[in-house]
């Protein structure tokens, strides 16, 4: 028997959020196995400390077969300021 809440064929995602709170120019990069739930947590002040008190929209996500792949890409995206800037600019169009 599979315990409740256990995902089968689970995928992981690296994602980027853009703050839509007026006057705030912030982005956030993370990883998750449930994009909708994670975005809901960020927007209900139950997400990462740096996202609390702001409203967020999902502007980018990339799907992976393993948690390690998603975490590795998250690290790279967090440190690639050029790519983050391009993704933010693309989201403004």
Which role fits each region the language model picked out?
Residues 1-50, 54-57, 61-83, 89-93:
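GIY-YIG nuclease catalytic motif and its immediate N-terminal context
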């Amino acid at each position: 028997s599979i315990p409740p809440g256990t995902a089968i064929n689970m995928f992981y995602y690296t994602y980027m959020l853009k703050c839509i709170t007026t006057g705030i120019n912030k982005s956030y990069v993370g990883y998750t196995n449930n994009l909708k739930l994670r975005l809901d947590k960020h927007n209900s002040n139950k997400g990462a400390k740096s996202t609390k008190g702001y409203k967020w929209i999902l502007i980018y996500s990339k799907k992976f077969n393993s948690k390690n792949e998603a975490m590795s890409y998250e690290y790279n995206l967090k440190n690639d300021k050029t790519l983050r800037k391009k993704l933010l600019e693309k989201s403004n169009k």
